[in-house]
């Protein structure tokens, strides 16, 4: 919906970072445009240098992956200078802020937040689109309901689908939002306890800035034994997640990259997401950390 709102000419080029869930790039394809995959920096967010080397794009999907803010201010300024539409895929980033202390999801022409079950707040499935542009807003209101005319009759402006929330989901969402500050506090508690208990010469705990909120606490291995570590932790009943596979490694997306993406590929082989549910207790973190420290 956010990509459709831009009303770009079909086949327009839209940049997307190599490290993101396929939903980000699928939105570009579904809207009839051409993705341009670019590399990421060490913080796992989109690389401005890589973007500058890519084909000229009409829009950019910026992803503050795992709550990391990246070089968002420079990206925003570059998009403004080059007249590139900016969409934020802030699925992971509710509760995080950018270096200018603006909330993730507040600097783009449009922004998207996810409410799937494992996000900081949930409505079961779905999400929301944010914008302060009245044209985009009015389009979104129509397109979410079969592109129905403004008088809500059974006449339609054109093609549209049903993207509406159910009343039940909305009720759950309102309740979840009322608990957001508590969820943020729990995320910070978990982050602090990992910082106090993890210590190993085989990996580093990724540090988050004060204005950033981790979706998952993350370690960076000093070698490429990530599969061995995942299997070891699994044998101890500790579930972990690797990063999303780089987009260019998906067979149906391999043709959408024409810049070097070495950094994102190396990151995929070294970074691991740790258990970070808001219900995780300090005792459970102690067990996870001691197990990791013994690896």
Report each predicted region and the residues it spans.
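PLP-dependent aminotransferase-like
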Residues: 4-90
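Positions that flank functional sites
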Residues: 18, 43, 94, 120, ...
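Histidine-centered beta-alpha loop that forms part of the nucleotide-sugar donor binding/catalytic region
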Residues: 19, 33, 40, 64, ...
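A short alpha/beta connector and helix-capping loop motif
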Residues: 45-52, 101-111, 287, 292-294
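PLP-dependent aminotransferase class I/II
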Residues: 59-63, 68, 72-74, 93, ...
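Hydrophobic faces of well-ordered beta-strands that scaffold small-molecule active sites
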Residues: 86-88, 111, 240, 274
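Conserved active-site segment immediately N-terminal to the catalytic lysine
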Residues: 88-123, 152-155
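Active-site PLP attachment segment
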Residues: 106-144, 167
